Amino acid sequence: MNNRPELLAPAGDLEKMRFAIAYGADAVYLAGQRFGMRAAAANFDDDALRQGIAYAHARGVKCYITVNIMPSCRDLPELPAYLELLQDAGADALIVADVGVIRLAQKYAPKVPLHISTQTSILNHEAANFWADLGAERVVLARELSLEEIAEIRAKTPKTLEIEAFVHGAMCISYSGRCLISQYMTGRDANRGACAQPCRWNYTLMEEKRPGEYFPVEEDARGTYLYNSKDMCMIEHIPELVQAGVDSFKIEGRNKTAYYAACVTGAYRAAIDAYRADPAQYVMPQFCRDEVDKVSHREYYTGFYFGSEENGQHYGDSQYIREFEVVGMPVSCDADGHTVFALKNRFFNGEELELLQPGKTPYVFRVHGAVNDDGEALELFNVPQMRVHFTFPFPVDAYSILRKKKERPS
């Protein structure tokens, strides 16, 4: 049992990587402009890959590169040079799924460890051992497994084979992400990173002899969201994950914001550290749960970890829960607490805000004395990207974020 599991955070671009690292990630996973499963993310061009890997390594953080699409023949000619680039850049592992890609990786990037993607649907110890025999250093288990099943896999595989599992984020309604609905309906191939997420759309029924007449599946005029999964959240179950033998806790979300990366990474970092400090007396810090509730998310559940989940779908809508919003992202700060933020959403003088910083509980305060670049103390700050100056009674971290509870429509 590994009492210090790795915390693996998403890095959709260089900014998100920096925030994930600042808030406690042990490792980040990212993709180049090709061959990854999140084509909608900004991702990293070749120069940014080198820069990002160097940035992470300078801070003791590992970088895993996703090369986990299911490629066709036309994709293969570009792969050898790309794999050589990743090895030369210092990638700590390649996340792979297709056996053809694995074969090429072993030939063109032989020094880089292989992590077998969740796309391969590893559901049992024989499958895990197969990949270990093929040279894999780590397997990313299918999301469909229970903790009991993970513990059995851990017990029946070599201790040198690392086990990674998703602990937080969006769930695919299809089997471990292998879905053809998007390609069928929109021409966008989910298995090449371009999923249109039709599972989040609303649907109605049409009876064969009544064309054009649409019937809601439930008594809701919007239709019903038949395929719409809730989001996974295991923040309250750190001990169970550790005891099951999970070596790496993976957060989903390369398409999410830097704020999301900061909040969720920081919450899991604090929970893991609290558990490690005293496993026998561990109680999850309440602010950890509060933090994951303050990012944009769908209704949470625990996936399949505690057995077959009958309540994993949310039929009413596919909207995110957004109770908090970012007010400002950092521009500069100094040792005297003078901090400048770029405005993202409006706020009023006297309004309650929260300052989020790495490794600390949020600092709640009412705005007094904030000024613009001209030194004017406005009643309302509402110009996007305007620079707003605050003075705090303590030095503020360069990766701090300002937020507030969202205004309710009147």
Over which residues does each language-model region extend?
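Conserved phosphotransfer cores of two-component systems
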Residues: 109
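Aromatic/His-enriched, Gly/Pro-containing loop or helix-boundary segments
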Residues: 117-122, 141
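Alpha-helix capping/helix-boundary segments
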Residues: 100-101
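Short beta-strand elements of ligand-binding domains
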Residues: 65-66, 96, 116-118
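Surface-exposed amphipathic alpha-helical tracts and adjacent flexible/coil segments at the periphery
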Residues: 1-22, 27-30, 34, 52, ...
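Glycine-rich, positively charged N-terminal anion/phosphate-binding segment
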Residues: 38-57
